[in-house]
Amino acid sequence: MSDETTQDKFLQASLRHLNALRNAQGDAVMPFPQGWFDLPDRQLADLGAMFFLISMSSYHKNRPLAQVFSTLETPLRLSQYRIFRSDGFPRAFFTWAGLDHSTERQFAVEHAPLRKEQWNSGASLWVVDLSAPFGHLDQVITMMAANRQTNRVRTLWHNRAGTRARVIEWNRQNADGEIAVTSYGQNQFIQQLDREA
């Protein structure tokens, strides 16, 4: 028996057992969609770092993979993320978006995921995702607060069970002012949005 025949038999037997995987990957002769691998190497490495951090976070790790990718792709493409590293290793990250009034309501009250065209729809700055599975949350918040160009930032806080959400707002009157922290329940935040309209 020749080596090629042995190799063919091995491949045939293996593929029979692994056929479900082959069917899950699409047609091998079809090219990948246009722009499928268009991210620069640095951004692909950053995407991997963010996936790693999410997988290590007890709060984030049960998200479906497709949801994680969908949540990270737009801020990655827009460079609206920051990864915090220690000794070269990723330790935390956050993503942000600038939302208009109606998108704030959809995101914070209706809990609708942001569409890519909504990430820069307005001037209201939101931290969309934040993961610090190694205990660096205090350092991340301190670094965010040091940004004197922003006077107000909002984020959604969910309890561990994911059954309740609150809007947390960091606000200062001017670049040198103290930062006030306000927490809004859903109805309180609706009233706040109505006052701002």
Specify the residue positions occupied by each region the protein language model found.
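Short amphipathic alpha-helix that is part of the acyltransferase structural core
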Residues: S2-V68, Q188-A197
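A short helix-loop-beta-strand connector motif used in the catalytic cores of GNAT acetyltransferases and
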Residues: S70-I83, D100-H101
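Conserved beta-strand in the GNAT
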Residues: I83-G98
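Acyl-donor binding region in acyl/amide transferases
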Residues: H101-E178
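Hydrophobic secondary-structure block in the mid-to-C-terminal portion of proteins
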Residues: N171-A197
